Amino acid sequence: MAAPTYTWEYVTNLYGLGAPVITTLEATSGLYTKIGTLLVMSSGQVDEATASVVLPVGLAAETISVAATAADPVKVMLLRPGDVIKGTADADASSYSGFSGKLFDFNTDGSLDVADTSGGCASIWRTEDSGLTVFIVLTIFATS
């Protein structure tokens, strides 16, 4: 499976913390990433976030263009409470900006799933580009 179409970029931390730590974790077999791929933990190893992910761990800090084998090292930017990441929504999300109380999850292509407001993990802080560029804060993590 190829790396996702859409990736995320660290922007800031709302609590004034510095940039997140980048650490090396183990990859799952077959993992492909781009820098900024949203990642989750799966049986103690890092895997690409797919549809309906609600427990992310961080963002890929390196590109893996040849399928990883199980336990290959992969650099991951570990996300924390208050970290803002910027990415793409699959529809206009502007009506949800300003921490609307709705939580969203993600699509298989890596974009934010604006139509799904049940059981998600991402709250929208603000939007740009007619609501298609979103700045989100994750509310729960695999490390929580």
Name each model-derived stretch.
Residues M1-S144:
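Surface-exposed, low-hydrophobicity beta-strand/loop segments enriched in small/polar/acidic residues
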